[in-house]
Regions:
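Metal-coordinating catalytic core of metallo-dependent amide/deamination hydrolases
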Residues: 1-90, 122-129, 134-135, 185
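Phosphate/diphosphate-binding loops
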Residues: 1-33, 107-113, 117, 143-169
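Short, glycine-/Ser/Thr-/acidic-enriched flexible segments
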Residues: 2-4, 34-39, 88-90, 114-116, ...
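Divalent metal-coordination and catalytic microenvironments
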Residues: 29, 38, 86, 109, ...
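Long hydrophobic segments that form regular secondary structure
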Residues: 60-102, 214-238
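Short, electropositive alpha-helical surface patch
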Residues: 91-106, 182-195, 232
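Active-site-adjacent C-terminal substructures of enzyme catalytic domains
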Residues: 114-210, 217
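C-terminal cap of metal-dependent C-N hydrolases
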Residues: 180, 192-217, 222-262
């Protein structure tokens, strides 16, 4: 639910987790999706330092004022909605985190592509999930050195967030990147799309265990009794995939998909 439609959703009795009619239990109302800034490639992600090599100087664009962001988060939280706040630039993330702290909102920051070091521990402190898209780092690695040459924050700080105790969830942001979880897992673990190229920020790479867990609905990489029987079976071992080519080929090894056990 976008902010401009939030009041109508509240009036209709919607809230996060409510089952959608006709979905047979497979569809539920999600979070309030608030897009606080733009993107790196368009130089519209809102940053605390100006973009490199651009005249006139630009810091990106904030879609709402900080007060509006706080007000929408408060309204959502008071009426049973989680928040999913798109924030890419470091200053947009600071503003989003400040709003969460002020409103006690719960949910996720989407993307979190550049963070000031001081903001990294705040995710865990505030109980927020960092919803990350590692394939974007592969798409952006060359652009980062061009537009974020002197950033105040750390771009794509996957390992730093994990080490600070943040709950990570990984996705694709499709159609921006292909709807393929193995691309994200490969990027997070190996930091490159090809064995012919050095990893990007290897100090921020994650292990396979963490990446697989962040790619599941349960947040674990092991099945447990009582889990939903939504399972993909492979005839190859992702823990043994030590090259991006091997990890990115995992869709070719799917032998069975179960949804609700069927």
């Amino acid at each position: 639910v976008y902010p401009e439609r939030l009041r109508a959703a509240i009036d209709a009795g919607w809230h996060t987790g409510k089952e959608l009619p006709g979905s047979a239990g497979l569809g539920h109302v999600g979070a309030m999706k608030l897009i606080s800034d733009g993107s790196l490639n368009t130089r519209s992600a809102y940053c605390s330092t100006p973009y490199s090599g651009i005249e006139p100087l630009t810091y990106g664009t904030l879609s709402y004022t900080p007060q509006q962001i706080e007000d929408y988060m408060r309204l959502a939280t008071e009426h049973g909605f989680d928040i999913a706040c798109h924030a890419i630039g470091d200053e947009a993330n600071t503003i989003a985190l400040n709003a969460v702290a002020a409103t006690h909102a719960h949910g996720s920051i989407e993307h979190a592509q550049m963070l000031k070091p001081v903001d990294i521990p705040r995710f865990a402190e505030l109980g927020l999930t960092a919803s990350i898209q590692p394939q974007h780092a592969m798409d952006d690695r060359d652009v980062i050195t061009r537009f974020w040459a002197n950033p105040a924050g750390i771009p794509y700080p996957f390992r730093a967030l994990h080490d600070a105790g943040t709950t990570l969830r990984m996705g694709s942001d499709a159609p921006v990147a292909p709807l393929d979880p193995w691309l994200a897992i490969s990027a997070a673990v190996l930091g490159t799309e090809s064995s012919d190229r050095e990893p990007f920020q290897p100090e921020q790479c994650l292990d396979v265990h963490t990446s697989l867990a962040a790619s599941t609905a349960t947040g674990r990489d092991r099945l447990a009794s009582g889990d939903p029987a939504d399972v993909v079976l492979l005839d190859a071992d992702p823990y043994a995939a030590d090259t991006p080519e091997a990890m990115r080929a995992m869709p070719q090894h799917v032998v069975m998909t179960l949804l609700c056990g069927e």
